[in-house]
């Protein structure tokens, strides 16, 4: 099953975010099922020095990925490990902080988390206000998608950012 999270809820006219403990749980789930993650980093962007020891070289065609937003950004890959989790949770506190908007944030952009076979497990497109889980059988993301503005969408193709059309998705039932 695939899932999508939107930054806005049309039913309640509210902005939606994944932050605090919900954000840390999302990262824990991504780290559980992923081996590598990638981000777009522009020169002098925050975290580039802290993440450098965990950077890996990857053949460009080994992983599915989205194109950059600008010519100055480069795709960097990092191995998943506890030290990286702590770097990410110490510096970034919300899913929408994965952006370099020139104002509040100077962070790496568009994180993708990849399984050991190179397929995408999770991606965040902060510029367009959407996050995606591409789950397989046995991958439990219920601790994340049971909270917030998540929708199921079995028709999400891997690594293609769909036009968010509400009729393609159905609201998930929230657990109390």
Task: Please report, for each region that a protein language model flagged, where it lies by residue.
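Structured alpha/beta or helical-core interaction and ligand-binding surfaces enriched in interleaved
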Residues: 1-176
């Amino acid at each position: 099953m695939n899932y999508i999270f939107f930054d806005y809820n049309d039913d309640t006219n509210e902005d939606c975010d994944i932050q605090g403990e919900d954000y840390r749980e999302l990262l824990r789930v991504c780290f559980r099922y992923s081996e590598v993650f990638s981000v777009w980093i522009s020169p002098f962007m925050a975290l580039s020095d802290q993440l450098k020891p965990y950077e890996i070289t990857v053949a460009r065609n080994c992983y599915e990925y989205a194109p950059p937003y600008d010519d100055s950004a480069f795709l960097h890959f990092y191995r998943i490990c506890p030290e990286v989790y702590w770097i990410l949770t110490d510096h970034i506190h919300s899913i929408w902080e994965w952006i370099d908007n020139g104002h509040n944030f100077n962070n790496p952009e568009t994180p993708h988390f990849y399984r050991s076979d190179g397929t995408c497990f999770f991606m965040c497109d902060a510029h367009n206000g959407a996050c995606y889980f591409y789950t397989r059988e046995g991958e439990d993301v219920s601790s994340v998608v049971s909270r917030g503005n998540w929708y199921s969408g079995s028709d999400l193709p891997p690594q293609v950012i769909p036009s968010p059309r509400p009729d393609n998705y159905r609201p998930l039932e929230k657990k109390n």
